[in-house]
Amino acid sequence: MLPGLAVSAQAHAAERDVYVASCRTSVEGSRVTAYCHNPYPATDRVQLHVECARWWDIDSDSAPVDIGPTAYAELTQRCWKEVGGAWISHQPVPDPRPGT
């Protein structure tokens, strides 16, 4: 194998790690909605996490959703009262094709 090709393959593998869906969140009262679009050729698994402001209000996580290439998804969660914070986590989905 040529040394230049090995570096190129490593750079491509590192580049693949940044294939995550573009997401934005919206908070309306006690409800949080995440709007995600995946413009990349790899599937991204996203999950919405909501932290409620009140100590007695239970924090929640949505079920993970796989967003395929060019796909769009909306995830929602809520608190009983005010929302303290919300964020999205991303997890790459392994390529199901053998040999990759």
Residue ranges and their predicted role:
Residues 1-13:
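Secretory targeting and sorting signals
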Residues 13-100:
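Post-signal peptide N-terminal regions of Sec-secreted extracellular proteins
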